[in-house]
Amino acid sequence: MMVTRTRKIHLHPRLETAAALLNALPENAVVADIGCDHGRLACALLQRNETWRCIASDVSAPSLEKARRLSANIGGEGRIDIRLGDGLTVLCRGEADAVVLCGMGGERIVELLDAADSPLMGARLAVMQPMRGVEELRAYLYISGYRILDDRVTEEAGRLYQILSAAPPCADGERDTWPADFPAGCFSLGYRAFERREPLCRTLARQQLLQTQKRLKTAANTGGEPVLRRKEAELLTILERWEH
């Protein structure tokens, strides 16, 4: 019986990267995993950080029941609060130090952030992993004044994913600024990953360039061509400056 209670939870690369972006949180931190599915991330965090507590929420009652069973298997029942609900509405202001929004579309993440009564419901950090719609998410974060803290690219099952962390807007309204060698206004890739010259970021830039150029072949003289031309120019600039 002790074997099941101490079984280490394995995370796939996307969630492992999300967990890494939470490492700077202090002791006794509270992490809210919004859209937790079966609760693997929350339970893994409890195993790795003995003083942390987690809030695991989802709109699916069957998923939450699986999360409840998993937390019981690792002996984490007393440190996890499982809640049925949608988005950040399950939180009271200030009760979580960090919120996690992984495995959903970027547009959906924007909806959940925008529907909150206050930015991140008082949390100091958000970790986000959009399955798609990353440009829409980054544009929203920039326009709303969120500050990008870190950016990662990870590979899972042959696909590249972007995972980013952000802090809520400053009271003075100051916005993020792009590095001098990164195209201002580029939302398709993360400039933090570019600054570190993260190898998978370069691979992703090449993939996006090929996809953009393929779309341009059928977008000539259409309303979408200028946007695609701009994206192509941004990606070419990133790749040209990579070695500098």
Set out the residue ranges of the language-model regions.
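Glycine-rich SAM-binding Motif I of class I
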Residues: 39, 43
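S-adenosyl-L-methionine
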Residues: 65-93
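Short SAM/SAH-binding signature in class I
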Residues: 96-103
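Conserved class I S-adenosyl-L-methionine
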Residues: 28-37
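Class I S-adenosyl-L-methionine
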Residues: 2-20, 89-90, 95, 107-244
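Conserved SAM-binding motif I beta-strand of class I
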Residues: 53-58
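Gly/Ala-rich phosphate-binding loop of Rossmann-like dinucleotide-binding domains
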Residues: 46-47
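Conserved SAM/SAH-binding beta-strand->alpha-helix loop
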Residues: 60-62
